[in-house]
Each structure stands twice: as structure tokens, then as C-alpha cells.
A protein has these predicted regions:
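Hydrophobic transmembrane alpha-helical segments in integral membrane proteins
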Residues: 1-16
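Hydrophobic alpha-helical segments and helix pairs
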Residues: 92-136
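Membrane-interface helix-loop junction between the first two transmembrane segments
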Residues: 18-41
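Membrane-interface helix-loop-helix modules in multi-pass inner-membrane proteins
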Residues: 51-101, 124
């Protein structure tokens, strides 16, 4: 898949989950909030992460060259934040973070399609560059 459709799918799923968590965890009209994150919520978040990860991979490594820009960096940071949150949700209760993080992730998922100003990276074959990039 190419174009804006994969970005829209991932962003829509993040936005839906953010709205859902806001209604069930933060809203004053919500009934008693469920304890912890439910299985379907965790699965939907995993699906959003996979869609967003696929979009990022295509943005960064599509066409056989590596491209990186400001919008891709923001998208990558929010993907990593949601991934860390998702993994940590298996071990600790982190309610209250979803309504904050997921709308930002939805917005940042769309950024690479709206602002595609990326430049080609020259030293991608260098092992030192690869180490630096993956550590950063």
C-alpha cells in the first residue's frame, strides 16, 4: 500500500482508541472505569502499531534508499512511545496516558504524508551509521 491510505488507517485507529480511552477513563459521565486495559483494547493498539510501523518502514526504507526528515522523525518518536507504552501495559497499569498519547500519535502518523520533505541519507551502508541510527 502506498499513498495516504495507510497513514489514514493507522491515524484513524489511534484516534478511535484515544477517544475510547478518554470516554471510558477520563470522562465524568463514564461509568466505573474498567481495571486495566482489556484484551480487545490491547489487540487494537497492537494493530495500530503494526499499521504505523509498516507506514514508517515504507517512508524510511521504500525504494531501496533510506530517507529521513523531520516529519518521519516525529512519527517514529510517537510510534516508539506507543510501543513502549503497549509493552509496559502488560506489567503495570498506565491508565490516563492513552488519551494523551494516542491523539498525538494519530497526528504524527499523518505528518509524513502531509509534509514529505525528506532527504536521502548518504552513508547508509556504513556500519557506524547504522549503529548510530538504531541507538538514536
Amino acid at each position: 500500500m502506498s499513498g495516504i491510505l495507510p497513514h489514514l488507517l493507522a491515524a484513524s485507529l489511534y484516534a478511535f482508541l484515544g477517544f475510547h480511552f478518554w470516554r471510558t477513563r477520563w470522562s465524568q459521565v463514564a461509568p466505573k472505569a474498567p481495571a486495566g486495559i482489556r484484551a480487545w483494547e490491547r489487540l487494537a493498539l497492537a494493530l495500530a502499531l503494526m499499521l504505523h510501523g509498516n507506514v514508517l518502514y515504507d517512508e524510511l526504507f521504500g525504494g531501496g534508499v533510506m530517507r529521513f526528515g523531520f516529519s518521519a522523525a516525529l512519527s517514529l518518536m510517537l510510534w516508539l512511545a506507543v510501543l513502549i507504552y503497549w509493552v509496559e501495559s502488560f506489567h503495570a497499569r498506565l491508565e490516563g496516558l492513552q488519551p494523551l498519547v494516542l491523539p498525538l500519535a494519530a497526528a504524527c502518523t499523518l505528518l509524513p504524508s502531509l509534509f514529505p520533505g525528506q532527504h536521502l541519507l548518504a552513508n547508509v551502508a556504513s556500519p557506524m551509521f547504522r549503529i548510530h541510527f538504531f541507538i538514536a
